[in-house]
Amino acid sequence: MVVSAEVIRKDAVFHVAWILGTGDSKKLSRREILDQNLPELCHSIIEMVPERHRGSATKTGLYLLSLLTYGTVLIHQVQVDFLKRDVEKLKELMKKKSFILLMAERFDRNQELQRKEDKFARLRSKPIMCVEELDRVDLAHLQAIGDELGINGNPGDFIMMDALPNMNQWIDNNSELNAIYGCVEPYLREKEITMHSTFVEGNGSNEHNKERRNDAVIADFSQLLFPEIPEITLGEKFPIDVDSRKRSAILQEEQEEALQLPKEASEIVQEEPTKFVSIALLPSETVEQPAPQEPIQEPIQPIIEEPAPQLELPQPELPPQLDAIDLVTIPASQQDMVVEYLQLINDLPDDENSRLPPLPKDLELFEDVILPPPAKKSKVEEEEDALERARRRPSSRPVTPINQTDLTDLHSTVRPEDPSFAIDSQIHDVLPQRKKSKRNLPIIHSDDLEIDEAVQKVLQADYSSLVRKKEDVIAKIPPKTDAVAVLMNLPEPVFSIGYRLPPEVRDMFKACYNQAVGSPVSDDEEDEDEEEEEEYKYAKVCLLSPNRIVEDTLLLEEQPRQPEEFPSTDNINPPRQLQENPVFENLEYEAPPHPIRTARTPTPIKDLKYSVISLFPTPEKRRETSIIAELNLDPIPVEEIDPLLTMRTEEELENVRRRQKSSLGVQFMRTDDLEEDTRRNRLFEDEERTRDAREDELFFYSSGSLLPNNRLNIHKELLNEAEARYPEWVNFNEFTADHDRKKAATAFEGLLLSLKNMKVEAKQEDPYFPILVRHISHEEM
């Protein structure tokens, strides 16, 4: 037998799981999903799994089982989402409660706890016999007494009341035992009895059987126990102290107010015990004609409610709808029987041992006395009946709602029929098709995927030597609160630490600005007017040394100085700015060895030397001074310094065309007419100084990228150099020392490509250290 998809879809257990698993467009309500029993659903799916080597068993396809399993997972997910949403709403609702409501709830909770504490303080275990008559008990009958009362009958169970703890002490001292075995069960007998039952439920006896225990308590043990002694005799023969009287008064109050335990007697017919709350006797003259007049003010309630000695437990209360019953509401056919029964009760003697007469068998007092249900309840029942009739109708078409309100009805569709596992005459092979997921899932390769050896080597290569941490690469600049002397020792330019220097030092190193050192470069072939060209200014940054500005003066060597004309260098004080600043107190000021003067004379003087001033005696400055002294440079006369001579001379047109295709060079607009370009350059020679590409240290403009052939040639140069010097390492920094910036960047790009293609290997010891490159020989590999 084969289970088809149609049978599973109509099954009441798999209906919701099938809809969710197949992605059906039918909408399910919240109640339908929450009503699903997941353990039962999983058990049903397991039962449908076919077993091995059993051809006659019910066969269910793996595809159907997988859909049901997937639907079960979706049901669990939706149920968890509903629970999470409800908890969040409840949490928000609790947050919105006002402070007054919270205080009111806390006050009510404290009142309830106080009431329970007062009740436990008054609660004591209930006695079962009098302590004064304990010696008269026949120990031979003790086992029978224990069996009837529901205790083990051990003599240790009869203990004096003063040796027993109260309820609070019992809970505090035996909390663990209470959690395992239960609490003490009270058994009520007489008023002045002071013996207690101290056994615990679950100790091997049959105390947990409430019906048997109630029958035993209600039964009469006069044959086994001693005869009861009146209170007067007890008082004369065995005086009772004041505390026992107080406890007996408390027990009497609890009997009248708190205790409401069920009571069933073995002699009474197995019917619900009756209790008349407000019933009054009428004279015999008015019984035949009941009227709503005032009843006689002699109630029989005390006689009925006072229990007999054998029945110590109170009667259970009647339902609330029977509290207001009067004789007028009793049917006419039952009134005579009720009056006769009440007359029998009235004629009973005033004896505590007297019992109520049995109820007449034909008395049906409360069968027809049923109050009409509320209007709202009747309306709900009518709606449920209508929905049930619509659900059980033979038609399979769902209920068509009449208005918009019924559209949200949870029972607007037909309940699926019971599953029938009979073999279908026509099994439809058309299974529901799920839509393809729109998510871009990653491609899962097979296990036998072959990877090229070169790719494996690249993936396994260790480039950790080229990776540096950010902390190692970033320049570590001292904080702003460092001393100026520490800043002076740094080999960094002024512009990187100038903002941390005091104003007195910053005034000594001012940057100068050169005007119009370049103009924008465009690759457009169209000519632009000269008026549209904008001039750009660039900042010139100097190192930590005074600006060397050549003026129209000559350095004159002073004649042999006289002692009185020039003071000693030992008495020369540092500048006023350095004296006022306390930062420079510990700095050493070195005066110039040969004081010089400037004179505006065109007469050159031979044998002139540079004079060096060491402003701050730092190691870098001392090294710079020693280098300048070793060079022994001759000063250049001012008339020989011509800025126009430093400009670029005229070049051939072919060289200009080749240079314009390079990446670095501050050039003008590229045009086809090179003669016009040359003429335009001459116009700017008188107004501004055109800087060469190598002189521009900060900014450059590009006239276009390198041609592909030039780019590949630069890459090939590095490979050829590394292959020629194999197995030695090639210093990449020295290799690109003579290159311009863009050519060096292109060479570095070739280095990265060669590393990726495993043609070369590189290493670098520390940041800012030279990069060493070596050719990789694949023959050795």
Curated annotation (Swiss-Prot):
Plays a role in meiotic chromosome cohesion and segregation. Necessary for sister chromatid co-orientation and sister chromatid cohension until meiosis II. May also be required for repair of programmed meiotic double stranded breaks. During spermatogenesis, likely involved in spermatocyte centriole cohesion, thus preventing their separation during the second meiotic division. This is Meiotic recombination protein rec-8. Residues 397-407 have a biased composition (Polar residues). It comes from the Eukaryota. Changing residue 625 to A: Reduced overall phosphorylation. One of its GO terms (molecular function) is damaged DNA binding. Residues 374-418 are annotated as: Disordered. Expressed in premeiotic and meiotic gonadal cells. Expressed in spermatocytes. It holds the Pfam family Rad21_Rec8_N. Disruption phenotype: RNAi-mediated knock-down results high embryonic lethality. F1 worms have an extended lifespan, an increased incidence of males phenotype and improved survival to toxic oxidative stress. Worms have defective meiotic chromosome cohesion and chromatid segregation. Phosphorylated by air-2 in vitro. GO terms for biological process: double-strand break repair; meiotic cell cycle; meiotic chromosome movement towards spindle pole; meiotic sister chromatid cohesion; reciprocal meiotic recombination; regulation of centriole-centriole cohesion; synaptonemal complex assembly. Coiled coil: none annotated. It comes from Caenorhabditis elegans. Keywords: Chromosome, Cytoplasm, Cytoskeleton, DNA damage, DNA repair, Meiosis, Nucleus, Phosphoprotein. Residues 408-418 have a biased composition (Basic and acidic residues). One of its GO terms (cellular component) is chromosome. It is found in: Chromosome; Nucleus; Cytoplasm, Cytoskeleton, Spindle pole. Belongs to the rad21 family. Highly divergent. The modification Phosphothreonine is found at residue 625. InterPro entries: Rad21/Rec8-like, Rad21_Rec8_N.
